[in-house]
Curated annotation (Swiss-Prot):
Gene name linked to the record: tmk
Role this protein plays: Phosphorylation of dTMP to form dTDP in both de novo and salvage pathways of dTTP synthesis.
NCBIfam families: DTMP_kinase (TIGR00041)
Pfam families associated with the record: Thymidylate_kin
Its EC number(s): 2.7.4.9
Descriptive protein name: Thymidylate kinase
Record keywords, A-Z: ATP-binding, Kinase, Nucleotide biosynthesis, Nucleotide-binding, Transferase
Gene Ontology terms describing biological process: dTDP biosynthetic process; dTTP biosynthetic process; dUDP biosynthetic process
Gene3D superfamilies cross-referenced by the UniProt entry: P-loop containing nucleotide triphosphate hydrolases
Length: 209
């Protein structure tokens, strides 16, 4: 089973992934927790480039192809082998992030992005995509505070530095994607307490076990 988590910055993906992975392991499943970018050796290097505020001037198309390179290698090196071994793969961001951020956020052609995603993903499609839906203004406050506390504002804060309007477009993109594929997406309100959100996530994932 392949589960992906999507959402705007600060939507709580890391927290909910931790809880879901623990619940899956308690249910006797072997879990591969991973992320894009950064889920493989190449991805770690690309992540440092993509998220750093030092690369604020990165061209939108260059940004896109770095994400696609990460995805292609990550699928081949991590995701596909884990699925073949019968593991439950839980991934922080996947193809939908590219459409939401580089498409709706940056303004690149979404049809082109879907086609490029298909090449990079090589047929590996999530069984379930959990979209943690949150007002971007709230999410940015959370994410900025998190990075400040961790001392990662410069190293991992490039997207948090974008204007609120950018993140509003990203959210709208996610909602459009979810509306187009209701069978794959589970849209969960990320505003309530972490416990309440975790319960909602498990309510969806548990049905697929």
């Amino acid at each position: 089973m392949f589960v992906t988590f999507e959402g705007v910055e600060g939507s709580g993906k890391s927290t909910q992934m931790t809880r879901l992975c623990a619940a899956l392991e308690a249910a006797g499943r072997t879990v591969c927790r991973t992320r894009q970018p950064g889920g493989c050796f190449l991805g770690q290097t690309l992540r440092a480039i993509l998220l750093s505020q030092k690369t604020a001037g990165l061209d939108d198309r260059a940004e896109l192809f770095l994400y696609l390179a990460d995805r292609a290698q990550h699928v081949a090196e991590v995701i596909r082998p884990a699925l073949a071994a019968g593991q439950v793969v839980v991934c922080d961001r996947y193809t939908d992030s590219t459409v939401a951020y580089q498409g709706y956020g940056r303004g690149l052609d979404t049809t082109l992005l879907q086609n490029l995603n298909a090449v990079a993903a090589a047929g590996v499609v999530p069984d379930l995509t959990v979209l943690l839906d949150l007002d971007p203004a709230i999410g940015l406050t959370r994410a900025t505070s998190r990075n400040a506390a961790a001392g990662t504002a410069e190293a991992e804060g490039r997207f948090e530095a974008e204007r609120l309007e950018f993140h509003q477009r990203v959210r709208a993109g996610y909602r459009a994607l979810a509306a187009a594929e209701p069978a794959r997406f589970a849209v969960i309100d990320a505003a309530p307490s972490p416990d309440a959100v975790a319960e909602a996530v498990w309510g969806v994932v548990g049905k697929l076990l």
